[in-house]
């Protein structure tokens, strides 16, 4: 259950931050970066955090379930599991982001990173704190 708590707590928070950053960059809002713009950005992030969890908790838990399934497959090492979960997060976020009016390579990458980074970060944290140590067997 620690794995799902990690994915549910970390995933939407990081994904929402990256989604706000991606839409800010894509809209051309940050032509000049100064402390006033950064404070407005962080204020908007804090104000929209509740909606980030509202819309992000279910996809984060779904990716957490995929990570849990891959954890129980003994032949998949941690690094491969991390890459698979990241690729699934990237693909899911890219497909969801393709519904936006803008399209192109930059939109594809920015929307994909919104799913890639939280999925890989949550999987790594779950590996550190939720996975039981595996016994080492001699041949």
Question: What does each of the following model-derived ranges do?
Answer:
Residues 1-139:
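Juxtamembrane/disordered regions of integral membrane proteins
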């Amino acid at each position: 259950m620690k794995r799902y708590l990690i994915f549910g707590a970390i995933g939407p928070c990081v994904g929402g931050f990256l989604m706000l950053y991606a839409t800010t960059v894509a809209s051309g809002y940050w032509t000049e970066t100064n402390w006033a713009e950064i404070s407005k950005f962080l204020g908007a992030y804090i104000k929209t955090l509740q909606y980030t969890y509202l819309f992000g908790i279910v996809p984060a838990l779904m990716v957490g379930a995929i990570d849990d399934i891959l954890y129980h497959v003994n032949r998949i090492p941690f690094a491969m599991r991390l890459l698979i979960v990241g690729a699934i997060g990237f693909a899911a976020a890219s497909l969801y982001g393709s519904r936006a009016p803008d399209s192109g390579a930059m939109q594809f990458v920015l929307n994909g990173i919104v799913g890639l980074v939280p999925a890989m970060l949550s999987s790594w944290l779950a590996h550190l704190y939720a996975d039981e140590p595996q016994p080492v067997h001699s041949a």
